[in-house]
Amino acid sequence: MYFAILGTMSRTCVRAYAVFAIAIMVLTVAWFAFSISQAIQRNTVGAQQRFAQVIRRIAPRVTSKRQLTDAEADFIQNLCKNDDLIMALNIFSNRVQLFSWTYDDLMFVAGGGSELVPRSSSLFIKIFSGRVPYQAKDECLLFTAALRVLTPANIFFRGCVVFLVMLTLTISSMVFLVIEYLSVRRFQCAQGDARPRPAGPQGTARSRTDEAQVSPGTPPECPVSVF
């Protein structure tokens, strides 16, 4: 009865730990997906504000609606390169391209007019467009920019958290399995020792019993002949 209870407890512990480990993995993956989704929504608002700031910094420096000077182009290019969020920027004036810059030429293709067309759709990049009145109020500058709404640092941090949780869960699972294996082995050994051992041949058992009944020092009985 005792060993049966131990076996039942061992199986219950294994099942409980399996449920616990699966729940931790599911919750970790769900947290990663949820946090990424929340970060994208939150950073989209921040990227839109950054785009508005970039427009306000660039628009006053554009002195010609036909062509930018070298100083103006260098200023805008350095502004884009030093910004971690800007992936591409186009500036048009009456469908005349004044400026075009991309972080990676392989990420975007030429679209109609002033459009920025990504080669592949991505949840991490958003396209923003805005118009700013030029010197004459009937004319305007058209800005189109692609901004990152999730930086590699954000993904790396969340990935590290998931990795550490999975690593801890893996190590704890290995330790649990080793402890459980040793417990099962001890249980099997104890169960084997508790089993009754088979008796030997009946003759041998009887002779040992007879020998045990004869006290030491008692002379053997001799047969008495009757005349």
Curated annotation (Swiss-Prot):
Residues 192-227 are annotated as: Disordered. Its main location: membrane. Residues 217-227 have a biased composition (Pro residues). The chain crosses the membrane at residues 13-35, 155-177. One of its GO terms (cellular component) is plasma membrane. Keywords: Cell membrane, Membrane, Transmembrane, Transmembrane helix. It comes from the Bacteria. It is a multi-pass membrane protein. It is found in: Cell membrane. This is Uncharacterized protein TP_0173. It comes from Treponema pallidum (strain Nichols). The lineage of its organism: Bacteria, Pseudomonadati, Spirochaetota, Spirochaetia, Spirochaetales.
